[in-house]
Amino acid sequence: MEFQISRTRRPYEFNMWKSHWHPYYELFYLVSGHCKIFINHSLYYLEPGDMVFIIPGEIHRTTYYSSPVNERITLSFDKEYLNDMTQSCGSHLTDSLFQSSKVSIPAGSRSYAEELIQKMVYEGAGQDGYSPMMMRNYLYELLIFLSRCQEARSDAGKMEIGEKAIEEAAEYIYHNYGAPLTLNEVAEMIHMSPAYFSRKFKSVTGFGFKEYLTNIRIREAAQLLINTGKSVTDIALECGFGDGNYFGDAFKKIKGVSPRDFRKMQGIR
């Protein structure tokens, strides 16, 4: 992948059937409708004109609500696609953008952003040999424009007390995935009954408790398989899987291959 752009309309009833993460950058722009997106351990409410930045490896799930039809535009690209911009402007601009996770474009400026995106869609159809250069330049222009719109704007005011507590629980899981965590333990930590916590966690994040915990553990295990020479058994234990067979089954369910085969696919023996 170098660069991809897609425009999608989703009905209110649509929800991502599973969480996912990927090895490339993603810009998610909401054209119409309303949705919330849970990224790693943080919840964001999106309205038309909001742009979300997702960096490689971030676990996320989108849930739509209130509007019968929701329209979004997604731009995906790998790190190398930004090389020319980084060399010209330095990495500060892109680093600060992707650390912010969300930018709200003022209503009076949305047409500018959407025109740039539409130009990328046009060039993406492959007009001629200049199209790849034009798409790259339009993306760079969009990123500079977004950096000018950037504000430290929090969604905390939109969240209920219960939602804030769920964010706190998710952050705890995110940083303590290697421990033998249980639903009861985390529910007690934020002073909720296990049954209520289970329902609330699902409604806020889009994930079931076990699903979220397993996805975090598998993501970290995949990185250890690629970047270390540790044995599969040691990685399973380090990532909170007390049973090697369960680790293998969970890994294959999410990644489609066994841990050993995944490592071989990366060219690692």
Functional labels for PLM-detected ranges:
Residues 114, 133-140:
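Non-catalytic, well-ordered alpha-helical scaffold segments
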Residues 171, 175, 180, 184-185, ...:
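Terminal helix-turn-helix DNA-binding modules in bacterial transcription factors
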Residues 1-51, 58, 65-66, 87-94, ...:
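Generic protein-terminus/edge-of-domain signal
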Residues 1-14, 56-125, 143-152:
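A hydrophobic/aromatic-rich effector-binding and dimerization subdomain
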Residues 33, 41, 49, 206, ...:
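Conserved phosphate-binding and hydrolysis motifs of nucleotide-dependent enzymes
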Residues 98-109, 124-135, 144-175, 179, ...:
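Short, Lys/Arg-enriched, Trp-marked, Pro/Gly-tolerant hinge/linker segments that flank
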Residues 31, 114-125, 170, 174-177, ...:
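Regular secondary-structure segments
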